[in-house]
């Protein structure tokens, strides 16, 4: 999967993706960083210990978690948006590869999974922007069928 990610397109071949893979007991550290992020962005009046515990414990739902980090290039000709899009392409490549291998894979973002404190916890050397995490494992049941709006509602044709 990581090899598939490596071949995603990036403007100027900047390859801005940075991944951290969490398996086994290392997920406990990741869960602690999720709980800390929840504590940091939740006002004291709204803080709920049960939600904090849920953030900490969610890492045990899947055996593998992969962070989706963006390390933008200093090149002035490449925008930060292009770097984010490149990492999104890398994530899509990983998700397609996971599916081809029969693995269940979910991209989880949100305030906790993209919080700067989580980024600092997993990448002390380089300041990253997190787009979230892929978590994956073997599906417990048959894969649900997807639903999408009709293509005609999403495409305009010009001649």
Say what each PLM segment does.
Residues 5, 66, 72-120:
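Small-aliphatic-rich amphipathic alpha-helix that forms the alpha element of a beta-alpha
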Residues 39, 60-73:
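Acidic-glycine-rich active-site phosphate/pyrophosphate-binding loop
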Residues 24-26, 71-73, 138-141:
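Short loop segments at secondary-structure junctions
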Residues 1-61, 159:
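N-terminal amphipathic, basic helical "cap/leader" segment at the start of enzyme domains
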Residues 130-159:
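C-terminal helix-cap and adjacent tail motif
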Residues 118-131:
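Short, electropositive alpha-helical surface patch
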Residues 16-17, 62-65, 93, 131:
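Short, surface-exposed beta-edge/turn micro-motifs
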């Amino acid at each position: 999967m990581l090899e598939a990610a490596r071949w995603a397109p990036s403007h100027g071949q900047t390859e801005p993706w940075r991944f951290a893979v969490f398996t086994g007991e290392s997920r406990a550290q990741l869960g602690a960083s999720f709980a800390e992020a929840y504590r940091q962005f939740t006002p004291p009046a709204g803080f709920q210990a049960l939600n904090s515990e849920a953030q900490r414990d969610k890492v045990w739902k899947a055996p593998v978690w992969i962070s989706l980090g963006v390390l933008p290039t200093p090149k002035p000709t490449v925008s930060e948006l292009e770097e984010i899009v490149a990492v999104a392409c890398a994530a899509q490549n990983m998700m397609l590869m996971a599916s081809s291998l029969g693995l269940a894979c979910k991209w989880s973002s949100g305030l906790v999974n993209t919080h700067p404190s989580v980024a600092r916890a997993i990448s002390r050397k380089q300041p990253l922007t997190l787009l979230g995490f892929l978590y994956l494992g073997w599906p417990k049941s048959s894969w649900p069928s997807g639903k999408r709006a009709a293509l005609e509602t999403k495409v305009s044709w010009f001649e």
